């Protein structure tokens, strides 16, 4: 056998050996994955993500998937003649828009993800936040401007655990309702954070369009709360990244072991972040 053939085989073997202690460590643990961005739009990336999630479940990690779908909601709204408006990055949601969100997010987007995981050998089940009181919500503090945008009040962990114990991957659409039956649009990042805290998850992983926290040309492998505060003060962490960073540390304060931010456009980033020493994104640490 030529050295050209031996080299890649040896590299593959080394990756598998490196993964083994992580597989042992995380068997039976719960990972909440927030799925969004470009990884939801490109067919190659969608298939790769579904493969990665299926593999994680096959090696014994309990996966709970929370997804976004903002672009799909906007497209559906446009077809129905509805204009999308945003305040501080949140979609203004009236009764017409909440119907579009429920139809699109809990309908087509959710079922497409379930189908894709199934095609790659996984067993997924679509869950609307309305199912079995999965997500109870209350109005956002800025409801006067935002309308039917909600914040998570309570998670039905018994239902999610029941699905996970059956070997299924719950795929959760972040909509919720209150005790009066009012429906709410819930930010997917916020929903993923609340679900991971409620489940006492080992990890929360944000699959996004950025490679991690970047300083100059370097992606930080880890970042502490003090380091993040300094980078925010210096303007290096800015814009939409600030609430994501704040949410990550709030999630850890709530008892979640680790929070990761990875690039969904990078090849097999989910597996590499979890099963290799170096990782590929940024890990938030206490």
Swiss-Prot record:
EC number: 2.7.2.8
Protein's recorded name: Acetylglutamate kinase
Transition state stabilizer, annotated site positions: 34, 244
Family: Belongs to the acetylglutamate kinase family. ArgB subfamily.
GO term, biological process aspect, one: arginine biosynthetic process via ornithine
Classification via Gene3D superfamilies: Acetylglutamate kinase-like
Matches recorded under CDD domains: AAK_NAGK-C (cd04250)
Superkingdom, natural source: Bacteria
Keywords per UniProt: Amino-acid biosynthesis, Arginine biosynthesis, ATP-binding, Cytoplasm, Kinase, Nucleotide-binding, Transferase
GO molecular function annotation: acetylglutamate kinase activity; ATP binding
InterPro entries (alphabetical): AceGlu_kinase-like_sf (IPR036393), AcgluKinase_fam (IPR004662), ArgB (IPR037528), Asp/Glu/Uridylate_kinase (IPR001048), NAGK-C (IPR041727)
Major subcellular location class: cytoplasm
SUPFAM superfamilies: Carbamate kinase-like
Subcellular location: Cytoplasm
Ligand binding (substrate): 69-70, 91, 185
Pathway: Amino-acid biosynthesis; L-arginine biosynthesis; N(2)-acetyl-L-ornithine from L-glutamate: step 2/4
